[in-house]
Amino acid sequence: MKHVAVLGGGPAGSHAAECMARAGLRVTLLDEKLAWEKPCGGGITFKAYDKYPFLRDNGAPKQFVHQTWLGAHGAGRVKMDLNQPLIIYSRRDLNQLLLDRAERAGAQLEKTRVLGFERLEHGWDIRTREGVLRADFCVVATGARNPLREAGTAWKPADTMVALGYFVDSRQEHIDIQFLEELEGYIWVFPRSGHLSVGICGKGESARQLRARLERYMEQNGIPIKDSRFYAHVLPSLERQSWRDNRVSGDGWLAVGDSAGFVDPITGEGLYYAIRSGDLAAQCVLDETTAPEAKPAAYRALTDRDFARDLYLGSMIARNVYMGRFLFDTVPARMIHFIRRSPRFRALMQDLFAGTQDYETLRERLFRNLNGTLQEVMLSFFCRRVVPELSNP
């Protein structure tokens, strides 16, 4: 394999291009915009920067956040310190960081729009505005709105969620997360370098309904809408059956990041999975022990073992996390109560924010700690409400 074309220059495509170019392959990365400000919170978890330290150790503008406030209807708000900080980037700055790394590794970057591609007996003809590029193999990294319907995940409307919001000229040091009544989604306020990203993501409601919810929240919390720049985007949020049928690879191509549907169905977080899938795609392409015709199956097996099975498990519980009930209240409200009163549950939530708690072992951990959590909640309630002087020795 002599020449690989990477179709898309977001985090997934950029990192795949870097890894392959660094190993000596000829790599051409094609993207219409290259670095641009994508509507996204821009959060990098400990799980991501622990595996890929360059996400932490670089000169790009970024914000280290050590504290979050979480709220839910009927439960108020609670402060939670993060054991491991979240790193928040402007997506333009993050994309530029990754593109620069790819270019330094030897990848050729071309700012052009991919109009389509055609499978040949040996390789691909890729049509762009400037002409036709021939490549031996393709890595598809064209994002959630993938225009290349022949490759990448083939999702249905139910497999997406709307994300929209505002870039606000304001500052704060912490993250805000607000769960809303009857919504499979949440509002976020992320501090970036120089501004806030204030947004909402959710399933089952129109963009107009979500925008109304967000603007009501902003007005209630004194966050200015006037002169703030609006953004909107579609995120993959695959349903359970769609994970089973997900099309992540095919004859001569591998899909990475959003174009493969690799986004957490509960949190909407996709940056770790973008970079990780780019890494795994590069490993698969570079593996000389795997024949070209066997690479699609090998890549699917790699992603399944590494993270895709866990995302599938997340899709099985996503609706209950937002819309379910537990102990006569909503699950989000109970989460707030438990964070406030139970050190065990608070530690679990800190691990979820760090990305170190997977969904496969989440149920077991919850049930293993349930008795202790409830005891802590009751003891906290007793000390603070029944005998308040005990909580203030």
Protein language model regions, located:
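Beta1/beta-strand and adjacent pyrophosphate-binding region of the FAD-binding site
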Residues: 1-12
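Conserved hydrophobic helix-helix packing surfaces used for dimerization/oligomerization
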Residues: 4-6, 27, 253
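Predominantly flavin-linked oxidoreductase catalytic cores and closely associated redox partners
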Residues: 9, 23, 101-228, 244, ...
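Conserved Rossmann-like nucleotide-cofactor binding loop
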Residues: 12, 35, 145
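Glycine-rich FAD pyrophosphate-binding loop
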Residues: 21-40
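A conserved beta-strand/loop capping segment in the N-terminal third of enzymes
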Residues: 44-97
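FAD/FMN-dependent oxidoreductases across multiple families
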Residues: 116, 206-285, 289-297
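C-terminal helical "tail/cap" subdomain of flavin- and related membrane-associated enzymes
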Residues: 283-393
